A protein has these predicted regions:
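Inter-helical turn/loop segments and adjacent helix faces that build the functional surface
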Residues: 11-20, 40, 59-60, 82-87
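Long, compositionally biased charged/polar accessory segments in the mid-to-C-terminal portions
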Residues: 117-120, 125-143
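Iron-sulfur cluster-binding cysteine motifs and their immediate structural context
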Residues: 28-50, 65-92
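Immediate flanking context of iron-sulfur cluster ligation sites
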Residues: 14-24, 61-72
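Alpha-helix capping and inter-helical loop/turn segments
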Residues: 83, 140-147
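Short Fe-S-cluster ligation motifs
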Residues: 53, 57-70, 101-125
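Conserved Radical SAM active-site core
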Residues: 52-53, 79, 83-112
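Ferredoxin-type iron-sulfur electron-transfer modules and their immediate structural context
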Residues: 1-32
Length: 148
């Protein structure tokens, strides 16, 4: 499970938790993870996971991840089961802005008040503006040659 939703209000619909796996022989998440963070047993190596490395404050980031500012979710978007899931019908879950339309310079020039106004109701507050700026600076810098 990558997420959980906790509600403060009653809802008239609940579904039963799914026990088991629908993955079968599918390896889409394993084969397409940009950093190889999804192991064959479908566990996640958090040290390699782009989402963990760009979002979690406790996760140190030493190397650049060119093109990645916050999060990834390639494993989720490539999952055939997730692709078939019904879209939500609740406006409260609609995106409040398009983060893909923002470049690194926008994030670097933003102050805390602007960040709170734009992102205060989004999961981006989890990483915070400081972490997003660090990611923008690191990922804009030329990547150092690998020591292999």
């Amino acid at each position: 499970m990558l997420g959980e939703l906790i509600l403060t209000e009653e809802t008239d619909r609940y579904d039963a938790p799914f026990e088991g796996s629908r993955c079968g022989t599918c390896r889409s998440c394993i084969d397409n993870c940009p950093t190889g963070a999804v192991a064959p047993d479908r566990t996640i190596d958090t040290g390699r996971c782009i989402s963990c490395r760009t979002i979690e404050r406790e996760q140190p980031v030493q190397t650049a991840l060119p093109g990645w500012l916050v999060g990834c979710d390639a494993c989720q978007s490539l999952c055939p089961w997730n692709r078939r899931a019904p879209q939500h019908r609740n406006a409260a879950f609609d995106a409040v802005f398009d983060p893909l339309a923002m470049d690194a310079a926008t994030w670097l020039g933003m102050d805390e008040a602007a960040f709170e106004a734009l992102c205060g109701r989004t999961p981006l507050t989890r990483s915070g503006l400081t972490r997003i700026r660090e990611n923008a600076l690191r990922n804009a810098a030329p990547e150092e040659p690998s020591e292999r």
